[in-house]
């Protein structure tokens, strides 16, 4: 008996079933809703999970290129809408759903998507206060991004022209609702940015509405573009109770378009009033400062040091006189002490008669005398140096003032200063130097004195 059975391989069967799925038009584009199950996020990879309802579930694959386009972060148990196609995975012979799009289900999904995006951008620091730019006090030009037909631009222009007519306002129209709104808002902001520093501040806004109506101002692309603006942005989206991500990232938020215009412009009347007040305060401060400086000048004019400038050096002159006196006294005391020592040694030498002792004493005397003269010479040299320095200080201060107190100095015919009577001879001609001239005298008598007493 001939066996007419045809046996297929497992691969052939899986391929056949796969072709059935691909040829079925109902499975080319399938839209599903369900709850995410077994979802485990895989970094930089394809995502594998299940989609289930109350009665059954199906395995789902979402390739990395599709997953990276999602505007929210899927989580376990989240209800979602997905679209894609059904096919067979050949190696295992199992069919599964290949998801191409995914979005949260219902209005709650929008809030969840908003929450996730807000957390993401907050972690990046887009809402931090340190990134907020200061609104200029006196803007020259203001750019407004809103609908060209709404009441927003009218309220802004009326308020700004009333408060600060100097400011020029330019409208950059954009759709503020619908699927294309986010792209037009971003395009308008980029157009403003491309003009450099033409504008001082930007106002972006629209009137109130539902979450879906305000959704363009929650789009990530809009938030990032506001953050990237080089000039400050004031957001006025919806009513005061509405808060969008555009409000959080903007440099300032206003509850209404009118409030936004007030935020962007100063009140000219208030500014003029402040100028008048500041002018009065400035004038008073200047007058007070001038009065204070006059008082200081009067005190300086009456200061003793300016009335008698020479008194500045009185203390230094007294110090020099005191040093000279102490130097002379020290030299006299040292000479008296050393003279007494010498005389004592001479007496002791006379008391010793043996020649050897005499020779020894002679050597000791010579040694002592040598040391004495060396010490005296060194001491005198040191004292002379100190005296010279003191005299130099005195001379630096005012040598003429020393002469003006009645002092004179004497020179011989060669111009040498005479400091001792030992330098003089009878009938020798000398010059006495005064502060206002010189006198020539002859030596008639020479009398030596020691310590102020005439020598006998």
From Swiss-Prot:
Q: Does the keyword Transmembrane feature in the UniProt annotation? A: no
Query: Its Gene Ontology biological processes?
Result: DNA catabolic process
Which Gene Ontology terms cover its molecular function?
Answer: exodeoxyribonuclease VII activity; nucleic acid binding
Q: What is its EC number?
A: 3.1.11.6
Major enzyme class:
hydrolase
Cystine bridges: which residues?
none
Keyword Cell inner membrane applies: no
Gene Ontology CC: one annotated term = exodeoxyribonuclease VII complex
InterPro entries per the UniProt record, alphabetical: Exonuc_VII_L, Exonuc_VII_lsu_C, OB-fold_nuc-bd_dom
Where does the UniProt annotation locate this protein? Cytoplasm
Show the coiled coil region(s). Answer: none
For this protein, what reaction is catalysed?
A: Exonucleolytic cleavage in either 5'- to 3'- or 3'- to 5'-direction to yield nucleoside 5'-phosphates
User: A Pfam family name for this chain?
Assistant: tRNA_anti_2
The record's CDD domains line, in alphabetical order, gives: ExoVII_LU_OBF
Q: Which UniProt keywords apply?
A: Cytoplasm, Exonuclease, Hydrolase, Nuclease
Task: Give the protein's biological function.
Answer: Bidirectionally degrades single-stranded DNA into large acid-insoluble oligonucleotides, which are then degraded further into small acid-soluble oligonucleotides.
Quaternary structure note: Heterooligomer composed of large and small subunits.
Q: Which family does it belong to?
A: Belongs to the XseA family.
Its recorded name reads: Exodeoxyribonuclease 7 large subunit
> In the UniProt record, what gene is named as encoding this protein?
xseA
